[in-house]
Amino acid sequence: MKNEEIRFSDRRESQWLRELINEKWFAYIGVLIVSFLVSCTETVDNAVLSDKMPTIFPDYVGVTIPATIAPMNFNVEGDVDKVDVVVKGSKGGEMHVQGEYADFNLDDWHSLVASNKGGKLTFTVCAKSDGRWTRYRDFEMYVSKYDMKDYGLTYRRIAPGYEVYSHMGLYERRLDNFDERAIIENTQVPGMCVNCHTSCKTNPDNFVFHIRGDHGATLVKSGGKCELLKAKNDSIKGSMVYPYWHPSGKYCAFSTNMTRQGFHIVKDERVEVFDLSSDVFVYDIEKHQLILDTLLSTKLYSENSPVFSADGRTLYYLTSLQKEYPLQFKDQKYNLCSIAFDPEKGAFGNKVDTVYNAVSMGKTVTWPRPSYDGRYLMFTQMDYGYFSIWHKESDLWLLDLRTMKAQPLKAANSDDADSFHNWSIGSHWFVFTSRRIDGLYSHLYLSCIDEKGQPTKAFLLPQKNPKEYYTTSIYSF
């Protein structure tokens, strides 16, 4: 029963988690050995011209990238002995690499991409196989005019499984290079699960996550102090699950869910995660109090996945008439609703509005995420339920909060599950999970929204050697 978790972060996480759990630190003495290796760059002679694009992994052909992204290294598919790649910028600059795969120098890459912001890069790819070179049609990447100033991404990595907590952790990955480090791993809390981590916007000074297990709790960090909340109490029905911070950092909204899972017996469907009931409430960080309302805790309906608007005066959430499981699992469909919130008084309004009626279209929505500039709200739409990670038909949609019109993000979506998502602080770039590679593992993709609400073709999070990384890792994001 695992959900994807990803967030942008505007700077490196502090060491407070490590200090909190009294992790032992060891001093390492590093010995830097610098080796000067003489390598021969082979001249590409008598290359056979192909009218086809190179088949590369990841598929970076025609993608749009931010000027600060890590090198977009790629592998050429097939039985290839060596690749030769020349990259030219439309505004000037050129770089050349040759090797087993396209492995771009970090400094050279950033220099070239930065100087071509708002322009494009043209890639000329040659591949050597059986002693012969083939030159493919050139392809392009576009360098966006929109900045992505975020320091990195935070995410959970977790191995396959349904019942047992194997090795997992919350991790931080820089976006301008390939550096990754653990924020916390469950080896530090043996036999337990860590999940549902959320920061206030992209600021790690305010941070919350859950520790699941016999002695579990919800850890809330705010103002340099940490508080451990009981996983359950008499005021709420189930465990505290999906959190979202108020932009002021004074409140954090939660759902409380009685979650279960069941296994399908039909082809291509594995697991269905559902709730027997769920409610929504807000926690006052300063007063250490729950803010409850009967409108968000109804008997016949399940309320779920709360998020605050950019100005903090509206709480969006999901609601569905609770069905009987397992017989009516395909009838559980959620609408997107909202209720006013007064941050000065810490109180809700007196009526609920339906923002997006998915049920009337025979669909359901999940994971609402407002952009930080207040312009859009992104959500995932699918056939039923709310746990989209297991739904191949799930797609990302964008609701324009000015016109209240919604549209699918066709250029970013795929034929497999496109699911959990979060915005960059600039409200143009967003990250989301997708199972488009193999239908089994969730991986991270990035895309950008322009002024008209149109997305760019999504690209897979760059890795040093992408083929090696994505084919040998057994972890989902």
Q: For each of these PLM feature ranges, what is it?
A:
Residues 1-46:
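Bacterial Sec-dependent N-terminal signal peptides
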Residues 40-477:
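Sequence signature of WD/YWTD-type beta-propeller architectures
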